[in-house]
C-alpha cells in the first residue's frame, strides 16, 4: 500500500539528506539516527521521524491530509534554505531521484518549494 506519494517521498528525502549534509558540515562526521533527530529538532524544528516515515512509506493516510504533509515538507525545505548551497541541494535531489527511481521508475518529481528559491541565494 502506498501511504505517501512518490513526490512526498522525494521532498522528504531531500529534507533528510540536507539535514545530514548540514550536520556533517558542522560536526565533521556522519550522524547516528538519534543524533540526527536531536540535531534536526533543536536547530530546525524538523521532526525527522515524520520525514523518515514518509521516505519509508510507513504511516496511515488518514493521519494527515495531503495538503498538510506537503505544507509541512515545504516549511522544512524553506527552513533549511539559509544553510544550503547549490551543490548540497543538487546532491540531495540526485540522491532522492536515485532512491525513488528504483521504486517508481524515472518519473519527474517537483519540489514543494521552487528550485528558484534555492538558486537565488547562490
UniProtKB/Swiss-Prot annotation:
Primary gene name: yfmB
Protein name: Uncharacterized protein YfmB
Gene3D superfamilies found in the cross-reference section: Hypothetical protein YfmB
InterPro entries documented for this protein: DUF3212 (IPR021579), YfmB_sf (IPR038074)
Alphabetical list of Pfam families matching this protein: DUF3212
Regions annotated as coiled coil: none
Amino acid at each position: 500500500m502506498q501511504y505517501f506519494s512518490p513526490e512526498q517521498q522525494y521532498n522528504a528525502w531531500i529534507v533528510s539528506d540536507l539535514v545530514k549534509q548540514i550536520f556533517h558540515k558542522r560536526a565533521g562526521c556522519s550522524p547516528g539516527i538519534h543524533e540526527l533527530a536531536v540535531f534536526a529538532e533543536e536547530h530546525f524544528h524538523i521532526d525527522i521521524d515524520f520525514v523518515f516515515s514518509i521516505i519509508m512509506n510507513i504511516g496511515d493516510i488518514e493521519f494527515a491530509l495531503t495538503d498538510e504533509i506537503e505544507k509541512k515538507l515545504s516549511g522544512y525545505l524553506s527552513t533549511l534554505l539559509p544553510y544550503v548551497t547549490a551543490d548540497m541541494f543538487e546532491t540531495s535531489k540526485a540522491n532522492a531521484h536515485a532512491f525513488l527511481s528504483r521504486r517508481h521508475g524515472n518519473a519527474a518529481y517537483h519540489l514543494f518549494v521552487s528550485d528558484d528559491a534555492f538558486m537565488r541565494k547562490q
